Amino acid sequence: MLSPKRTRFRKQHRGRMKGISYRGNHICFGRYALQALEPAWITSRQIEAGRKSMARYARRGGKIWIRIFPDKPVTVRPTETRMGSGKGSPEYWVSVVKPGRILYEMGGVSEIAAREAISIAASKMPIRTQFVIAG
């Protein structure tokens, strides 16, 4: 699963997801892509599940690019803990995704195969997405 090798700070504020994605919203590497239509946090487990399902469907043919990286730590407090005594410890990593962001790209396969592989990956995502073709 994806996670940063090191970060400047162990914990982050939650922040808020306003507006649309102005960066990472064009197809750069492949010919077909999966684009987010809603804002969400996508965990490293979900990214990996989507990648595995696409790779399994494409088998040897084609290449897959992951365009998002989980760089935000999410902290969780232990269960049945009283309020106070600081912020919880980092539990997992998420990628902040805004509408318009390209999640995965694919190339070197036919459109039918790419559409099917990307739809399988889309079913693993917690948001609505769309299939996009470059050009």
UniProtKB/Swiss-Prot annotation:
Q: Which PROSITE patterns match?
A: RIBOSOMAL_L16_1 (PS00586), RIBOSOMAL_L16_2 (PS00701)
What keywords are assigned to this protein? Chloroplast, Plastid, Ribonucleoprotein, Ribosomal protein
Q: How does it assemble?
A: Part of the 50S ribosomal subunit.
Which NCBIfam families does UniProt cross-reference here? rplP_bact
Family, as annotated: Belongs to the universal ribosomal protein uL16 family.
Alphabetical GO CC annotations of the entry are:
chloroplast; mitochondrial large ribosomal subunit
What Pfam families does UniProt report for this protein, alphabetically? Ribosomal_L16
Q: Chief location of this protein?
A: plastid
Q: Where in the cell is it found?
A: Plastid, Chloroplast
A biological process (GO) annotation for this entry?
mitochondrial translation
Q: What is this protein called?
A: Large ribosomal subunit protein uL16c
Q: Name one GO molecular function term.
A: structural constituent of ribosome
Q: Which InterPro entries match?
A: Ribosomal_uL16, Ribosomal_uL16_bact-type, Ribosomal_uL16_CS, Ribosomal_uL16_dom, Ribosomal_uL16_sf
